[in-house]
UniProtKB/Swiss-Prot annotation:
Keywords: Nickel. It comes from Methanosphaera stadtmanae (strain ATCC 43021 / DSM 3091 / JCM 11832 / MCB-3). One of its GO terms (molecular function) is nickel cation binding. The keyword Acetylation does not apply. Belongs to the LarC family. It comes from the Archaea. It holds the Pfam family Ni_insertion. This is Putative nickel insertion protein. The lineage of its organism: Archaea, Methanobacteriati, Methanobacteriota, Methanomada group, Methanobacteria. InterPro entries: Ni_insertion.
């Protein structure tokens, strides 16, 4: 499956991403709980999720209010996020991925601000980054992205409307798009749009560039669409809602980058930690294969599959974590892929309805693979004392029985 980000009329904002992800099916209560855990450490916030019509279309509006307008240094924010994670979610894989993505988004904002103001990261106080509502926007959007398993799918973005005119800031009246927005979107196709006002925030733009795989001028060839609308605050003469389209791609191939390096100096414990680190940093798959190296020394070949946009970042992680001085890069590898879908299904287990996520693979509308999410199976197994292998077999059978007509 693919995700298409459509900000052709609405522009981009962090709370619009949250609303659109919830509209697509992300669990709003889980998102609110995670947002409050992090954002309340930066200042008191209040979150309200409601349905609102925009241009006659019912949308989900994520309203985030805070009375705290303090600013913080970039390094302070990163350290605080890590401290909160260690305190509340030290072993939660989805949270660890969320925080890694969030830190990338913060870094994008920090670099843009530093270039605009001509200061180093250590010297900057962040007006956009430091506030609790910006922390809420970034954490909430990143967490929802992983809740929907969108990191495993290709993300397209259509040209982004930036708005036009001028905007009043604490530095004076500036043209739209604002300098930080223009800097973040420097490699992104943009249009002015139909309105004479600012409709792109730096936070929304930073989220976009960190999750998009490819920028396209029109919708790709897709079927079986699910649509989510995230409402903006302003009432405009055009649709002020970010549209996210989750769909099956008719294209049967994908492109990825393969990274390889040979290692003979790491212990088994370090290799195990490296495996988890690479996945949490955005790798799609990691394999570690024993081999014999120069002078008959035993070693390992570490192979990583990642999105093209993540290749440089993952390369840096490999070098930092292993000490290797070289990584082989095999770019734009084409792979044949089945149409894939991530769905939620209610399964009756011993008289109780349990929510189980499935990864479904299709060829010509025929199910060729049906795999329940291990974390869900493990949770149910702990609750029911049913062996995991028996649970997997049972829920797969129940899914196929319940979906024979699909």
């Amino acid at each position: 499956m693919v995700l298409i980000i459509d900000g052709q009329t609405s522009g981009l904002a962090g709370n619009m991403f949250i609303g659109a992800f919830i509209d697509l099916g992300a669990n709003k209560d889980d998102i609110i709980n995670v947002i409050k855990t992090y954002a309340n450490e930066f200042g008191d916030i209040d979150i309200t999720i409601t349905k609102q019509p925009k241009s006659g279309i019912m949308c989900t509006y994520a309203q985030i209010n805070t009375t705290d307008k303090s600013t913080r240094h970039y390094n302070e924010i990163i350290e605080k996020l890590d401290d909160i994670t260690q305190k509340h979610y030290p072993d939660n894989e989805i949270i660890l991925k969320t925080i890694n993505l969030s830190k990338k988004i913060f870094k994008t904002l920090a670099i843009a601000e530093s270039k605009v103001h001509g200061k180093s990261l250590d010297q900057l106080h962040f007006h956009e980054v430091g506030c609790a509502d910006a922390v809420a926007d970034i954490i909430g959007s990143s967490y929802a992205y992983y809740l929907l398993n969108l990191d495993k799918e290709k993300v397209y973005s259509l040209p982004v409307a930036t708005g036009s005119g001028t905007v009043k800031t604490q530095h004076g009246i500036l043209p739209v798009p604002a300098p930080a927005v223009l800097n973040i979107l420097k490699n992104v196709p943009t249009i002015g749009g139909c309105v004479n006002t600012e409709i792109c925030t730096p936070t929304g733009c930073a989220i976009l560039v960190n999750i998009t795989d490819e920028y396209v001028s029109s919708y790709p060839y897709v079927t079986r669409k699910t649509i989510g609308y995230g409402a903006g605050k302003k009432d405009l003469e055009v649709l002020n809602a970010l549209r996210l389209v989750h769909a099956n791609s008719v294209t049967k191939n994908d492109t990825v980058t393969i990274l390889e390096t040979n290692i003979d100096t790491l212990s088994g414990e370090v290799l195990g930690s490296l495996y988890d680190k690479l996945l949490s940093e955005g790798a799609r798959d990691v394999t570690i294969t024993p081999t014999i190296m120069k002078k008959n020394r035993p070693g390992q070949i570490i192979k990583v599959i990642c999105r093209n946009n993540d290749a440089q970042h993952i390369t840096n992680v490999l070098m930092e974590e292993t000490g290797t001085l070289g990584v082989r890069v095999i770019p734009t590898v084409h792979r044949g892929v089945a149409i894939r879908e991530n769905i939620h299904e209610k399964i009756n287990i011993n008289g109780t309805w349990e929510d189980v996520r499935f990864k479904i693979g299709y060829i010509n509308d025929k199910i060729i693979k049906c795999t329940p999410e291990y974390d869900d199976i493990k949770k149910i197994a702990n609750k029911t004392s049913i062996p995991i292998k028996d649970l997997i077999k049972y829920v797969e059978m129940e899914y196929r029985i319940n979906n024979r007509g699909d």
